[in-house]
UniProtKB/Swiss-Prot annotation:
Domain of life of the source: Bacteria
Name the UniProt record assigns to this protein: Imidazole glycerol phosphate synthase subunit HisH 1
Active-site residues annotated for this sequence: C81 (nucleophile), H195, E197
Primary gene name: hisH1
Principal subcellular localisation of the protein: cytoplasm
Source organism per UniProt: Legionella pneumophila subsp. pneumophila (strain Philadelphia 1 / ATCC 33152 / DSM 7513)
InterPro entries: Class_I_gatase-like (IPR029062), GATASE (IPR017926), Imidazole-glycPsynth_HisH (IPR010139)
Biological classification of the source: Bacteria, Pseudomonadati, Pseudomonadota, Gammaproteobacteria, Legionellales
Record text on subunit structure and interactions: Heterodimer of HisH and HisF.
Length: 213
């Protein structure tokens, strides 16, 4: 049986994430100590809300260094929504805030308009398609294995991750033509801007692939 540890730091939809992994009979642990993070087989960092609040939650519980050490260990790591954004170096959300710096880059606001110049709704909420990126790696040996191009997943966000190295962008989505990082990857580390636990069969397939790494 595969096991996965989900970081419990007071910010995130832990139960829905846990249920998605339990669908595949995974052993799910909600971890609330640095020691539990370090002993995990696979680690998931979920999160909803503001970047600053998320980082404060991790700092208060002394989770910053254990998460960094886990990420460097080579074991599978997945950030979801805010959890993905915190993987980057910094965020410009309501000021300048330092992130975990697992992947070099910055979190910036989603463009307020499409490529045609027309204003669109922020936050970006709803189903949108996954598309390949020009410089990212092939999906066949990643958590997107078996995911067809243009599969739809569920987004809820006002900010987006911009890795410094475009090769770290595994998949994008297009919001009125504006490219947004949907999945980022650096070796053992993955981040999903969308919510796989709310994305139907496509999301469940991604979770299943993460359990098989």
């Amino acid at each position: 049986m595969s096991s996965v540890s989900i970081v419990d730091y007071g910010v995130g939809n832990l139960l829905s994430v846990a249920r998605a992994f339990q669908y595949f009979d995974a052993s799910v642990n909600l971890v609330s100590t640095p020691e539990e993070i370090m002993s995990a087989d696979r680690l998931v960092l979920p999160g909803v809300g503001a970047f600053e609040d998320g980082m404060k939650g991790l700092t208060t519980l002394n989770f910053i260094e254990p998460i960094k050490q886990f990420a460097r260990s080579g074991k599978p790591f997945l950030g979801i929504c805010l959890g993905m954004q915190m993987m980057l170096s910094r965020s410009t959300e309501f000021g300048q805030h330092e992130g975990l710096d697992l992947i070099a880059g910055e979190v910036v606001s989603v463009p307020s308009h499409g490529v045609d110049g027309q204003l669109h709704k922020i936050p970006h909420i709803g189903w949108n398609e996954l598309v390949s990126t020009s410089e990212g790696e092939d999906w066949c040996h990643t958590i997107l294995k078996n995911i067809p191009l243009n599969s739809s997943v569920y987004f809820v966000h006002s900010f987006m991750a911009m890795p410094s190295n475009p090769k770290k962008r595994l998949a994008d989505t297009l919001y009125d033509g504006q490219a947004i990082s949907a999945v980022i990857k650096d070796e053992n580390m993955y981040g999903c801007q969308f919510h796989p636990e709310k994305s139907g069969e496509v999301g469940l397939s991604i979770i299943q692939q993460f359990l098989q790494i």
